Swiss-Prot record:
Disulfide bonds: none annotated. Pfam families: Iso_dh. This is Probable tartrate dehydrogenase/decarboxylase TtuC'. The gene is ttuC'. Keywords: Cytoplasm, Lyase, Manganese, Metal-binding, NAD, Oxidoreductase, Plasmid.
Length: 358
């Protein structure tokens, strides 16, 4: 029996709702497979923890997480806590502290979901966005001076290192090489940002020589939004900076139907630390407690987690079950359905129990 230790951090808003659904589906997979076991420990960190203790997680939070095989994360952010506190107090310290430098965000149109793009079928939008997750625009460097005065100044410094850019570029090329189309698009803004972004372009060209079977091109980030919208079929694997990929992946989720179906994995490819898996969507306080949060993104990111742990059959079984449920029209309101979170979760669990695909 293969056993894994998972740290669950539901955190804020709909996070507890979708993580509970995700754990229910993982339990169904355990029962269906019969050859692996997941042991989960839940941590109450997040905005409510901050209101009680003045911090989003305890000082020894990373030490507590080190012993786990993976981290299953919900969502962070609350209306009554500044966003920079919630982000820099919980999610980013985990990503950066565990050197989860590869943020991997697959996007495709699931069966039964109608995308907003006219004449865009399931095969026309099937991407993976690779986001540099350790430096760049989210390095945390900068400051404020002369606060409250007319001369007040704020600086936000983006830091790009040769080591950081090279390793994410190599990761993206390897991923593109493993996909059927062997196609990679490198996104920058090197016409206007003439230092770090030009270095990105140069390093991309250097790394490309290691992967002669991968066809690659480069795009400016503003032009990329147009290409994603008008010519989605021309794209496959995409790599971009921390900020650019953050924005583009939200657009990708919307183009596929909803952020409610968009997953992400924060990966330490060297496996020195646990990697973290989370849905892209935010805490969504406007629907918190209504029972209508879309759990599909959480199920998909659970599949990413299983694949990372080496449970590829279980990951495939989960995604097969998800696609059968969406194709049957059992959908939450954000993708045009009438089902609630529990109904979608139950349907996926039933599909797993009856699955004979593997």
């Amino acid at each position: 029996m293969r056993e894994y230790k998972i740290a669950a951090i539901p955190a804020d808003g709909i996070g507890p709702e979708v993580i509970a659904a995700g754990l229910q589906v993982l339990e169904a997979l355990e029962q269906r497979s019969g050859d692996f076991k997941i042991h989960t420990e839940t941590f109450d960190w997040g905005s409510d923890y901050y209101k009680k203790h003045g911090v989003m997680m305890p000082a020894d939070g990373l030490d507590k997480l080190k012993k786990f095989d993976a981290i299953f994360f919900g969502a962070v952010g609350a209306p009554d806590v500044p966003d920079h506190i919630t982000l820099w107090g919980l999610r980013l310290p985990i990503c950066q502290g565990f050197d989860q430098y590869a943020n991997v965000r697959p996007t495709k149109i699931l069966p039964g979901i109608t995308p907003p793009l006219r004449n865009c079928g399931p095969g026309d939008l099937d991407w993976v966005i690779v986001r540099e997750n350790s430096e760049g625009e989210y390095s945390g460097h900068g400051g404020r001076a002369h606060r409250g005065l007319p001369e007040e100044v704020g600086t936000e410094v983006a830091i790009f290192t040769r080591v950081g850019v090279t390793r994410i570029m190599r990761y993206a090329f390897k991923l593109a090489q493993a996909r059927p189309r062997k196609l990679l698009t490198v996104v920058t803004k090197s016409n206007a940002q003439r230092h770090g972004m030009v270095m990105w372009d140069e390093i991309a060209a250097e790394v490309a020589t290691e992967f002669p079977d991968v066809t690659w091109d480069k795009m400016l980030v503003d032009a990329m939004t147009v290409r994603m919208t008008l010519k989605p079929e021309t794209l496959d694997t995409i790599v971009a900076t921390n900020l650019h990929a953050d924005i583009l992946s939200d657009l990708a989720g919307a183009l596929a139907g909803s952020l409610g179906v968009a997953p992400t994995a924060n990966i330490d490819p060297e496996r020195r630390f646990p990697s973290m898996f989370e849905p892209i969507h935010g805490s969504a306080f406007d629907i918190t407690g209504k029972g209508i949060a879309n759990p599909i993104a959480t199920f998909w990111t659970a599949a990413q987690m299983l694949e990372h742990l080496g449970e590829r059959d279980a990951a495939a079984r989960l995604m097969g079950a998800v696609e059968r449920v969406t194709e049957a029209g059992i959908l939450t309101p954000d993708v045009g359905g009438t089902a609630n979170t529990s109904q979608v979760t139950e349907a996926v669990c039933n599909a797993i129990a009856g699955s004979n695909i593997i």
